[in-house]
From Swiss-Prot:
This is Phosphomethylpyrimidine synthase. Substrate binds at N80, M109, Y139, H175, S195, R196, G197, D236, S237, L238, R239, E275, Y302. InterPro entries: ThiC (IPR037509), ThiC/Bza_core_dom (IPR038521), ThiC/BzaA/B (IPR002817). Pathway: Cofactor biosynthesis; thiamine diphosphate biosynthesis. Catalyzes the synthesis of the hydroxymethylpyrimidine phosphate (HMP-P) moiety of thiamine from aminoimidazole ribotide (AIR) in a radical S-adenosyl-L-methionine (SAM)-dependent reaction. Its cofactor is [4Fe-4S] cluster. The gene is thiC.
Amino acid sequence: MRSDWIAPRRGQANVTQMHYARQGVITEEMDFVARRENLPADLIRDEVARGRMVIPANINHTNLEPMAIGIASKCKVNANIGASPNASNIDEEVEKLKLAVKYGADTVMDLSTGGGNLDEIRTAIINASPVPIGTVPVYQALESVHGRIEKHSADDFLHVIEKHCEQGVDYQTIHAGLLIEHLPKVKSRITGIVSRGGGIIAQWVLYHHKQNPLYTHFRDIIEIFKRYDCSFGLGDSLRPGCLHDASDDAQLSELKTLGQLTRVAWEHDVQVMVEGPGHVPMDQIEFNVRKQMEECSEAPFYVLGPLVTDIAPGYDHITSAIGAAMAGWYGTAMLCYVTPKEHLGLPNAEDVRNGLIAYKIAAHAADIARHRPGARDRDDELSRARYAFDWNKQFDLSLDPERAREYHDETLPADIYKTAEFCSMCGPKHCPMQTKITEEDLTELEKFLEKDSALA
């Protein structure tokens, strides 16, 4: 779809959406996003220029359907997929991608660490994806040296990053905010470093006793991203991995560095979003969102959860969706889903479905709470269908129509029950929605109440 849009830009030194927005240009991608979001195109341009919105759109991802992540747009959901050394393959990951898109993923991250040729897996996913694809390049850096990350040089990291750009990756998680001086701050934590990318960089720093190469070569990464319009997802290497560690000095020290890096990228018109926690008690979620906005000059915030309790392995799509809904309400732009398998294993297709639906609920609830225009229209339409016992319309309006129909049909499968004025919960005689109060009923009641009031 984008081939004709991109052709005139190829070969230019800077092809980012932010670069064009700051020149006053409304690109085809911005116009497409404006129609998707039902917002004025000049507002989209201005938000991208300001850095409060990103449109992840690598010029080599030509089959992309552009979307926006930012406070002015609807709250978005990211789904993680990816093969591991112990499970999955190309075909399975492409099927997970298709399932994620089916159930509403706005972006998808390929977090493959094994299971085959990582370049082939990534290319297959990008070629099949209408949504932006994100990656974590240090995973491939580690895989390429068979787990001996200390063997990598800064140039090796840059080579992997540029390769991902060439393949069409729309945004990359770059763990540049973890500084050597931050590492002693994790000593008082229960779970230390829980970011895989952060752990890889920490290994390199501890071995060489040198500063993080992604930090020292950050401007080199910017130059690469400018040529492809790849967006930064600045990784939170020191995000808390349990409630005890939330909002500690390690996390907030890195956040300050991420804010500085955000502004450096903006100086070169490169788009940035900032990743966040993690595991956070409910009473600290608002603080975390506000603090990110303050430190990072309102760059879009993108959180993993956060989980609001640590005692529910197997149900962390629920513990995290609670925190995600709150974070979205307070202004987080994108929610990274968590599946029931979090902390336990690699998610399968059903886990992807359950995680995505939980997060679509959270994002939608946040949009309603933030009074985004039209956010509640679908809810009201479904409520009218429910009151009218229009079962098929209820199913169609659901976030997961197949699941809604499946649960209804477990006890009342016959077609005749699709027009019945009851379900198996109340049965035919006890459904309160059968009590229809008409205008005539209310008029008669008002007359009675007026008469009764006069007698009193």
